[in-house]
Every structure is written in C-alpha cells, then in structure tokens.
Amino acid sequence: MVNDSIFIKKGVELEIEVQSLAYGGMGLAKVDDFVVFVKNGIPGQRVLVLIYKKKKGFAEARIIKVLKQSPLATEARCDHYWICSKLQTLSYEEQLKEKEKQVVDAFQRIGGFTDFTINGVRSAENKYNYRNKMEFTFSPHRWILESEPEGVNSSFALGLHIPGRYD
C-alpha cells in the first residue's frame, strides 16, 4: 500500500525498483498499481527518480540516482549511450528476453490471442555497429557536453539528431 504521505505528482522524488521494460525501452515500475515509466531504467535497478510528467493512469520519471545497480547491468560501450541507445547498459541476452516478453504481451493483451507459440528472438550476428539509418542535424547552437572545457565555441553544429530536441 502506498504511504499516504507519498503523492505522485510532477516534481515529486520517489525511491522505486524497476520491474521490467515497457515497449519503447523505458523502465516500468509500480507504486501499488500505479505505473511509473522510468527513462533509462533497467529491470532490477533501485533508483531515486523525479516525476516529470503525470497523467491519469501513469507517470514518467527520470533517474536522479541509482541506489542499487541491476544484476543485469553491463558497461555501455559508448559515452553518449544515454542519448542514443538507452539499453546499452542492459546485457544483450536480457535485451532479447525483454523483446520476446514484449511480443508475447502484444499478442495477448493487444491482439487477444491465447493459443500461440513464439520460437524465440534471433540474436544479431553483430551486437554493435549495425545501424542502417542515421539522422543528422544542423544547428546554430552546438550542444556542449559537461566534460568539455568552458568557453568552447558553440556557434555551429552538425551532428546526430538528439531525440526530443528541436533547436
């Protein structure tokens, strides 16, 4: 049962455990029966999150701090994984299991099918460097990483499109 002092709304911080992945790659956690989608969350993580969006049946949150790392976690190969490939910190084998669960869920919950067989998810021959589409963006304002020195020229940029950013 939710403690009466916890009221889920925009701006509230919560400590929760990510239970699974939702379609699209967000972590899924529940506070009682209330669903909280956690950006960049992976199953098994205990995290402190900030609610940034609240709707009638769910909320969306971003991780402030990982309190306990998931046993399913792995080291990301890319320094910018949190922008372009959020699931790089989830082991590849677990990614395949999650994809299969999502297919089963879609057939059962959305399609209404009960009698079917999934023959597993085929793994890619190469887990990395297989993208066949890239979106580039020109911008008058370069995105500056926190690790870059102050005073870096930010007047022009050509690079990969950052999801959710349109400037």
Model-predicted regions and their roles:
Residues 1-167:
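Non-catalytic accessory regions of SAM-dependent methyltransferases
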